[in-house]
Curated annotation (Swiss-Prot):
Residues 101-132 are annotated as: Disordered. InterPro entries: Ribosomal_Su5_D2-typ_SF, Ribosomal_uS9, Ribosomal_uS9_bac/plastid, Ribosomal_uS9_CS, Ribsml_uS5_D2-typ_fold_subgr. It comes from Staphylococcus aureus (strain NCTC 8325 / PS 47). Keywords: Ribonucleoprotein, Ribosomal protein. SUPFAM superfamilies: Ribosomal protein S5 domain 2-like (SSF54211). The lineage of its organism: Bacteria, Bacillati, Bacillota, Bacilli, Bacillales. This is Small ribosomal subunit protein uS9. It comes from the Bacteria. One of its GO terms (biological process) is translation. Belongs to the universal ribosomal protein uS9 family. It holds the Pfam family Ribosomal_S9. Residues 113-132 have a biased composition (Basic residues).
Amino acid sequence: MTLAQVEYRGTGRRKNSVARVRLVPGEGNITVNNRDVREYLPFESLILDLNQPFDVTETKGNYDVLVNVHGGGFTGQAQAIRHGIARALLEADPEYRGSLKRAGLLTRDPRMKERKKPGLKAARRSPQFSKR
């Protein structure tokens, strides 16, 4: 008989991105959509952003992260993953709530793209004005 592997789940959202995150005790490997995080995300700054919950809780290298993410662009996806990791860490140990909350990692960022209005070229950009 095998023991069930301990795993913590968290769902993160940002803009139009949704990330389903699973934390498994391990060496600190991060896999996004079955690819290594360095292969999936093009910028080092996004990877640093994504690791912020581990830095705040001082758990870097304690968990392997398995992520399924869809929707949005690279930045939205990275921040959705960060949100999901923070929620999963909270499930792993409720003691982390204070430090994660102070760092603003548990709050869902509500900012979304503003819709285009009729008669305008974009959300707020109006057509070019011609005096004559």
